[in-house]
Amino acid sequence: MKILVLALRCDRLPLRALFIAACGMGLTFIASKTLAASPVGLWYAEGGAAEVQVFPCADEFCGRVVGLRSPLGEDGCELRDDKNPDSALRNRAIIGLLVLTGLKPIDDDQAAWSGGSIYDPASGHTYSCIARLEGNDRLFLRGYFGIQLLGRTTTWTRVGATQCQSVNR
């Protein structure tokens, strides 16, 4: 009689293990959905000429210039937003300038955003913007007027230990 009871308990063991494994896979799936690709972080823009901090703002993503390779102009003064079409804003420092706003996730794509705008302080122009993350360390941004065909794509590289050695600073 005791042997039979042990046999029944041993038969249950594979079912328990299967149940635990299934729960673990389910949790992994949920975690992967919650930890979807994100543009949040520090990025080298324009080949390392600027560092932009991308952060969540409401239900969107925004980006602010937090560093420049050459923060001073020819006159030795801090670079200003002197190309801005609004003359009242031309005295703003480039460092600290909000250059990326309004990026919202595209419904089906976990690593793409649209509906945003990107400001180019070098020209004073603001463009419509879409973004796509490739892997975890490359962010492609396309700024355009009207239709995406009439635009330019730039690649930002996430700042990290390996990039610090490979980007000329």
Predicted regions and their residues:
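Edge beta-strand at a domain terminus
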Residues: F145-R169
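K/E-rich alpha-helical interaction surfaces of small helical-bundle regulatory domains
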Residues: A37-E51, R152-A161
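N-terminal signal peptide c-region/cleavage motif recognized by signal peptidases
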Residues: A31-S32
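Residue-level recognition of beta-strand termini and adjacent short loop/turns
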Residues: D107, G135-D137
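A mature extracytoplasmic/lumenal domain signature
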Residues: G47, P56-A58, V65-G67, L133-G135, ...
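Bacterial N-terminal signal peptides that target proteins for export
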Residues: I3-A22
